[in-house]
């Protein structure tokens, strides 16, 4: 097992000047979005542009954006119109525009927790973890003592059944920001609270996954085993099957070759593959197989799916290695 003192080292992203990237283009006046623009700088110093979207997905996302834009144009100060415009922009990888939309919304509705929740999520996407945490902590403060609400899915699952709520998504993303920075200790109480409050198996497995990894990174193997104890093959998940299979791997109930299927050839890896691959990579790392872990993390980063949490987490692992 890798020593916990090494694994728990906080992540502090290097300061990189975006204007120093010679490949960046300048937006022209009146242009809503230049597809060559830099959306973010990775934790490894790479420029990140638009999301890699398939020819099958792109038209649907663009149609959804047009619908959200139309609703926004009709009611530009309505909080829901603002939120959906920002969400639809973000699905297309237009993250900076989405952040700007949420920021304008906050100027109109400064007490609306949904706006901070969504802007915080997108600050994670662009690797601005401190800003993400500030927004998500603000969102959390705004919902104290208020009833929870189901969060509508932007891309509904197979049963068209939302699995998340406002409160749970605030906490999920806040704890994730701590995890990605390497501040595993601060993530723990948030994960425990969310695990206690989870009302469906999709939430249970997604929270248990990151909670387990946080405990293992801190060298708390017994507590981590306790998180795994209630996980079983019979859990009813709608969209988080990857997390369930990874947890069963960690529990010793699935072989690794049944969890990570070969990546599709000839294109960018899927979000699901990036998520699962990170789970396998960290499993190797936790069991002392550094070379195997490094190989998988590099494969994820080469895959191009830079908005996936598994991609960001793999990037963070590689960035820590550079600074050792």
Where are these regions (language model features)?
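N-terminal leader/linker segments that initiate helical-solenoid repeat arrays
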Residues: 21-80, 84
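Short coil turns that delineate tetratricopeptide repeat
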Residues: 76, 110, 144, 165, ...
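Residue-level recognition of tetratricopeptide repeat
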Residues: 87, 121, 176, 213-215, ...
